[in-house]
């Protein structure tokens, strides 16, 4: 009998010391766990290094990356009355308006002002706990002056100078994310050049990762979970690259869960995608029928997170449990600054359930 999925199905114990609080000296120094799933109960695991990733690629393959750029979204200021305030930008709406989370001892009132640096910003609206905030000075300029890199809360430290470079992919272009597409952090220019020299193609989507990626799932029954929305753009160039990959019997390989989410959200059938620009709230859990993505390169994700549910949909709940247990035993480094895993193919949807 099919098991109704619960949040607790995705819990695992992680020793505290395996959380990578800082990046390694070089991006491509990471270890790489390669997990070839054969059935719902069988997975072949091998321990490799990031530089070995190229050996698992064929010239016909297509890597799809996310070229979003993380903005320094965390800012500190004070109310006109003097109370301290933390502003965490969730989304840029325009040059002068943002959606933001605001932490203060007392919630700011609509119409009130906050001082960030020398700039006054105005609270215009509040919906579902998120504020719309207006600034005369363009927010990108204000963030450049006052913002700090929005590193994940589980790093349990303040952002440092190194995070400005290392919590950003080398191919980051389009500003708008408030969290990094962390699978991409493992790639340096040299590795990308070696992959290209093998004939492997590359295409870029843009998905602005939101603060929702850090929000815990608050319900036990996953059918009741409301997935956060993220804006993405998928161009004709990507549409053509996916079609060309299909014509050559190559694999569409998502570099990260954000690239996967964009590709699957833009699926139009027959393994193809269409041009898209807008929001997605796609929530991928075991039993999901993948339309586009054939292989997934990703990091190790938090217990009970929507990202762990996504990789379980790709490789199977039981297989992911085995893979993660192996990673813990072998002392892999976890989360954003941690090591990587590669799933060279996926399971049929029905086999991914418990």
Curated annotation (Swiss-Prot):
One of its GO terms (molecular function) is S-adenosylmethionine:tRNA ribosyltransferase-isomerase activity. The keyword Protein biosynthesis does not apply. It is an enzyme of class 2 (transferase). It holds the Pfam family Queuosine_synth. It catalyses: 7-aminomethyl-7-carbaguanosine(34) in tRNA + S-adenosyl-L-methionine = epoxyqueuosine(34) in tRNA + adenine + L-methionine + 2 H(+). It comes from the Bacteria. Pathway: tRNA modification; tRNA-queuosine biosynthesis. This is S-adenosylmethionine:tRNA ribosyltransferase-isomerase. It comes from Dichelobacter nodosus (strain VCS1703A).
């Amino acid at each position: 009998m099919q098991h109704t999925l619960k949040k607790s199905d995705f819990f695992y114990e992680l020793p505290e010391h395996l959380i990578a609080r800082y990046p390694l000296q070089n991006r491509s120094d990471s270890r790489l766990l390669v997990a070839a799933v054969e059935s719902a109960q069988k997975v072949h695991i091998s321990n490799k290094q990031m530089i070995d990733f190229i050996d698992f690629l064929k010239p016909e393959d297509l890597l799809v990356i996310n070229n979003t750029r993380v903005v320094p979204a965390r800012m500190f200021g004070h109310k006109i009355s003097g109370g301290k305030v933390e502003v965490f930008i969730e989304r840029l709406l325009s040059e002068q308006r943002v959606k933001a989370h605001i932490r203060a001892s007392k919630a700011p009132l609509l119409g009130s002002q906050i001082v960030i640096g020398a700039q006054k910003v105005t609270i215009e609206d509040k919906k579902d706990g998120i504020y719309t905030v207006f600034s005369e000075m363009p927010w990108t300029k204000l963030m450049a002056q006052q913002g700090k890199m929005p590193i994940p809360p589980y790093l349990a430290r303040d952002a440092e100078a190194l995070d400005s470079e290392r919590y950003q992919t080398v191919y980051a272009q389009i500003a708008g994310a408030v969290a990094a597409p962390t699978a991409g952090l493992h790639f340096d220019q040299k590795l990308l050049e070696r992959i290209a020299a093998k004939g492997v193609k590359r295409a870029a989507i843009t998905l602005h990762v939101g603060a929702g990626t850090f929000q815990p799932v608050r319900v036990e029954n996953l059918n009741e979970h409301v997935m956060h929305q993220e804006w993405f753009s998928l161009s004709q160039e990507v549409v053509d690259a996916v079609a060309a990959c299909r014509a050559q019997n190559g694999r569409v390989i998502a570099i990260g869960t954000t690239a996967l989410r964009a590709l699957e959200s833009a699926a139009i059938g027959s393994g193809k995608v269409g041009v898209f620009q807008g929001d997605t709230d796609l929530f991928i859990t075991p039993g999901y029928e993948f339309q586009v993505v054939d292989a997934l390169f990703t990091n190790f994700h938090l217990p009970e997170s929507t990202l762990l549910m996504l990789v379980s949909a790709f490789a199977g709940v039981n297989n992911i449990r085995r893979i993660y247990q192996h990673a813990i035993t072998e002392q892999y480094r976890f989360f954003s600054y941690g090591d990587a895993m590669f799933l060279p193919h996926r399971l049929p949807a029905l086999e991914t359930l418990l």
